[in-house]
UniProtKB/Swiss-Prot annotation:
GO terms for biological process: translation. InterPro entries: Ribosomal_bS16, Ribosomal_bS16_CS, Ribosomal_bS16_dom_sf. Signal peptide: none annotated. It comes from Alkaliphilus metalliredigens (strain QYMF). The gene is rpsP. One of its GO terms (molecular function) is structural constituent of ribosome. Belongs to the bacterial ribosomal protein bS16 family. GO terms for cellular component: cytoplasm; small ribosomal subunit. This is Small ribosomal subunit protein bS16. Keywords: Ribonucleoprotein, Ribosomal protein.
Length: 81
């Protein structure tokens, strides 16, 4: 099973926020996921990012592939270098 760490869109029209989730690569963007590891709110000022570093490192160690956006958020939070 190919596992991705990606963003799940939530919120209202024109006011999105995102949950950072671990999901099967074949599942729909907003569909079934395995575990939630954080959230990202780009609308608030300043932008809110909260990631559970232990869970993220566990999934990265198990071979989960982060998407480009999630990789950027991980770098910003110091989870990956």
């Amino acid at each position: 099973m190919a596992v991705k760490i990606r963003l799940k869109r939530m919120g209202a029209k024109k006011r999105p926020f995102y949950r950072i989730v671990v999901a099967d690569a074949r599942a729909p963007r907003d569909g079934r996921f395995i575990e939630e590891i954080g959230y990202y709110n780009p609308v608030s000022e300043p932008k809110e990012i909260k990631i559970d570093g232990e869970k993220a490192e566990k999934w990265l160690g198990n071979g989960a592939q982060p998407t480009d956006t999630v990789k950027y958020l991980f770098k910003k939070n110091g989870i990956i270098k």
